């Protein structure tokens, strides 16, 4: 199992109160494969550095999790298939 940090930028037209519950659907993939979700941090609506699909804003969410590489690959695949997700970025944080 490895630690990952996943940043997700969602469509700004979504209601910010529904972001965390909708992310839980995707995170069930991690839990079902034996991984764990340490933290879900919804930053809210932020201005983008450049437009993504005619959107100048996006709802940012950062998730810290521990899972197998194959599980994180499946999570990223499912997120990219969702129309409400503008961008994803999966990082492996450095261990200090």
Curated annotation (Swiss-Prot):
One of the protein's GO biological processes: translation
Domain of life: Bacteria
Keywords: Ribonucleoprotein, Ribosomal protein, RNA-binding, rRNA-binding
Gene3D superfamilies: 3.30.70.60
The keyword Transport is assigned to this record: no
Record-level Gene Ontology MF annotations: small ribosomal subunit rRNA binding; structural constituent of ribosome
Gene Ontology annotations for the cellular component aspect, listed alphabetically: cytoplasm; ribonucleoprotein complex; ribosome
Family affiliation: Belongs to the bacterial ribosomal protein bS6 family.
Function as written in the Swiss-Prot or TrEMBL entry: Binds together with bS18 to 16S ribosomal RNA.
Name of protein: Small ribosomal subunit protein bS6
Organism field: Thermobifida fusca (strain YX)
């Amino acid at each position: 199992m490895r630690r990952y940090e996943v940043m997700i930028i969602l469509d700004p037209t979504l209601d910010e109160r529904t972001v965390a519950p909708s992310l839980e659907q995707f995170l069930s993939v991690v839990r079902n494969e034996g991984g764990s979700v340490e933290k879900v941090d919804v930053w809210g609506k932020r201005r983008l550095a450049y437009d993504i699909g005619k959107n100048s804003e996006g709802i940012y969410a950062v998730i810290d999790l521990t899972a197998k590489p194959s599980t994180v690959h499946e999570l990223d695949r499912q997120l990219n298939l969702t129309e409400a997700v503008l961008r994803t970025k999966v990082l492996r944080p450095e261990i200090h």
